[in-house]
Amino acid sequence: LTEVETYVLSIVPSGPLKAEIAQRLEDVFAGKNTDLEALMEWLKTRPILSPLTKGILGFVFTLTVPSERGLQRRRFVQNALNGNGDPNNMDRAVKLYRKLKREITFHGAKEIALSYSAGALASCMGLIYNRMGAVTTESAFGLICATCEQIADSQHKSHRQMVTTTNPLIRHENRMVLASTTAKAMEQMAGSSEQAAEAMEVASQARQMVQAMRAIGTHPSSSTGLKNDLLENLQAYQKRMGVQMQRFK
C-alpha cells in the first residue's frame, strides 16, 4: 500500500490539498476511515484536482474502504474513467482487462499495464469501477500505479522507457511516504523508555517536515536529505535501545 500511496500522490499537485489527501490515504489504508460516501463527497468538491486525478482517487477509495454492496457508483468517477469516450481506448481496455484477470500479483499487473496508454488504462479502471468486470485487488492496484506512472511521466516530460522508476517525482513522493511510515514506526517503538520522548520528538519533526514539503512543494531532490536524516536518527535511536530493525533500510 505504501507503493500505491506513493504513485497516487505523485500525480497530485503540491499544495495544502496534497497534504490533506496524503492524510486521507493513510487513514483509508490503515482502516481508520470507513465512510465511503462522505469520502467521495469530500473528493468530488476538492478544487485544483483534474477530473482524472479525482477519478483515480475515487477508484482507490472504492477499492479500499469497505462499503455496502449496493452503494451507488459516482458519476464524477465514471466520467473521468471513460477514456475520453474514445472507442479505441475501450477496445484496448477490454484486452488489458482479460490479461489482468489472469494476473493476480501487483507487480505482474503493473508490468502488463505499463505497455498501454493512459486512456486505455483509465477505461480499464472504469470497467472495473462500473462492476463490468472483477480482478483481484492486487491487480487493480497494479493498474492504478501503472496509470499514475504514465501520468507522472508525461508531467515530467520524460518519454524514455522506464524499466525501473527513474522519475524524480515518484522517487520524491516515495521518500516522503517512507519518512511518514518510519516516523509512525518510531512512535510505536518508543513505548515507555526514557528515550521515548526523544523518539517522539524526531518522529513529529519528520511528520511536520513531510507535511510542509507537501504543502509548499519542493524540488524532488530535497527529500533525499530528509530520508537520510530520518534513517540516521532512527539508527542511532535503535542502537541505544539495543534494537535492530531491518525494515527501514
Swiss-Prot record:
Segments for region (Membrane-binding): 1-161
Subunit: Homodimer and homomultimer. Interacts with NEP. Binds ribonucleocapsid by both interacting with genomic RNA and NP protein. May interact with HA and NA. Cannot bind NP without genomic RNA.
Described function: Plays critical roles in virus replication, from virus entry and uncoating to assembly and budding of the virus particle. M1 binding to ribonucleocapsids (RNPs) in nucleus seems to inhibit viral transcription. Interaction of viral NEP with M1-RNP is thought to promote nuclear export of the complex, which is targeted to the virion assembly site at the apical plasma membrane in polarized epithelial cells. Interactions with NA and HA may bring M1, a non-raft-associated protein, into lipid rafts. Forms a continuous shell on the inner side of the lipid bilayer in virion, where it binds the RNP.
Protein name per its UniProtKB record: Matrix protein 1
Renumbered ranges of motif Nuclear localization signal: 98-102
Membrane topology: Peripheral membrane protein
Recorded family membership: Belongs to the influenza viruses Matrix protein M1 family.
Domain of life, source organism: Viruses
SUPFAM superfamilies: Influenza virus matrix protein M1
Subcellular localization, as worded in the UniProt entry: Virion membrane; Host nucleus
Entry-linked SMART domains: Flu_M1_C (SM00759)
Disulfide bond sites: none
Gene: M
